[in-house]
Amino acid sequence: MVGAGEGDRVGGGAAVGGGQQFVDRSKVRILLCDSDPSSSREVLRLLCNCSYQVTCAKSPRQVINVLNCEAGEIDIILAEVDLPVSKCFKMLKYIARNKELRHIPIIMMSNRDEVSVVVKCLRLGAAEYLVKPLRMNELLNLWTHVWRRRRMLGLSEKNFFNDNFELALSEPSDANTNSTTLLSDDTDDKPKENINQETSTSNQHEYESNPSDAEPKQKGTPEGLLVSTEGGDQASSPGVMFSRPIKTNLRVAESSAFLAYVKSSTPTTSSFDSELQKGGNRLDSSDHRGNFSSTTDRSDTGTDVNIRDKEAFEMPVQYPVVCFSSSNLHLERSNEGQNDASGTPPVYHFPFYYPGMMDHGMTHPPVQNFQGNINNAQVHTPQTLLPQYNVYPQCHGVSMMPPFQYNPAGMSIQSNQLPTQNMWPQASSTPMPEETCSRSERRAAALAKFRLKRKERCFDKKVRYVNRKKLAETRPRVRGQFVRQANYTDITSTGDDISEDEDDDPSSREVEMVSSPE
């Protein structure tokens, strides 16, 4: 609810001068209006569990009569919307128009949660709209509406606070106690006393160890910065500042789930903090003795912090920078102090050759620039640690880099003692491949080839069996049938017989026909 935060602010701001004030809900009087008997009894029971004073009414007419008689004693009106609804809205209008009743906040409750009903109730002057079934934490914060309405109208505030701690709050085991109460009486001053004892003992140790330093601190510190302990320790160490920030004590009941969670999840003091504290004590003791040493013997305990490893984790990794120029090739080491302690000379990685990044006619640094001992280099540096570069194939159209010698930093090797694999290979005179034609030229060549192929096409009717066609052309056809050709010699020799028979039977005459192929 909106009023919960304001209620806490009121309760917290009222704690002045050692005494603490708490909300006394028994001073709040509520006028309950509900036409349903069962619902009215349930709401009445919840309000009584919250220690409110309740006056019941069954209709809007009874509410108006009670307000006309006891308007100054009613603090809150808790009414049902279905009285019916029309009479409920008339009651809201009547109370909003009456100047003597405007200071009473009206809280509506109903089983319905339609937006239209809620908006109309709020427009007619309702302070809040609650949906049944009501919850305990909603009813516990009803008194905040009274405080807000009076403050908004500029009226005098009612005293809802009680100085008596035991009368204001009940036992946490009771049924009428909820976790949303401002404070619980189960919180006593035991945790505060324990904290005060710890701080007082630590301050006492500091005062005993440095008695000469404590007096000027007290004299030079303004009164506003002095922190005095509470309870019985206030007189033991007055005016002594805490060596650490004050730990705020959250007052929560021991039976609450929050305290059980905090107890289970509170981490113990880490070993790293304890070791740092031990190291500070050792440094303080060494200052008093006047003995300063560069290293501290930490072999007595097995859990001491390795400062060297810690610095190694904290410092970022830095790499040597290799610089190139167009005139000469010079190597610059940006980190001189990051040498390995193992004794093996570091091998610095050279970048690959990129076309256009270095001049092909550059001068190479002589071998004498690298100072060192060839014997140490031969002992510590095997041949496998000397990589060879420029072994990757070069791009077409770019000449290879000429060979030059390179050595790890801190080594001086004669040219006759260098292995052959330490040389950059000379470029072989390989013929340059012809430049491939562009995409448009390839497309034009493909189109020309397609046109030539199209000209060679033949759209005539294809014959499947050529030999059969030739044989069919040589045979004569009569009415679609194949016939044999007649022999001319036989016809001439028997010409007379044929002429005689022609008159008698013309059908028996053999007719010579020459068929032409179709």
Swiss-Prot record:
Disordered, as annotated region: 172-241, 266-305, 483-518
GO cellular component entries: nucleus
Subcellular location: Nucleus
InterPro entries per the UniProt record, alphabetical: ARR-like, CCT_domain, CheY-like_superfamily, Sig_transdc_resp-reg_receiver
Amino acid composition bias (Polar residues), ranges on this chain: 196-212
Superkingdom assignment: Eukaryota
Record flagged with keyword Nucleus: yes
GO biological processes: cytokinin-activated signaling pathway; phosphorelay signal transduction system; rhythmic process
Induction comment from the UniProt entry of this chain: Expressed with a circadian rhythm showing a broad peak in the late day.
Domain (CCT): residue spans on this chain: 443-485
Domain Response regulatory as annotated: residue spans: 29-147
Main location (coarse class): nucleus
Keyword Signal applies: no
UniProtKB keywords: Biological rhythms, Nucleus, Transcription, Transcription regulation, Two-component regulatory system
Function: Controls photoperiodic flowering response. Seems to be one of the component of the circadian clock. Expression of several members of the ARR-like family is controlled by circadian rhythm. The particular coordinated sequential expression of PRR73, PRR37, PRR95, PRR59 and PPR1 result to circadian waves that may be at the basis of the endogenous circadian clock.
Self-association and partners: Interacts with PIL13. Interacts with PIL15.
Family membership noted in the UniProt record: Belongs to the ARR-like family.
Entries under PANTHER family matching the protein: TWO-COMPONENT RESPONSE REGULATOR (PTHR43874), TWO-COMPONENT RESPONSE REGULATOR-LIKE APRR1 (PTHR43874:SF1)
Name used for this protein in its record: Two-component response regulator-like PRR1
Provenance organism: Oryza sativa subsp. japonica
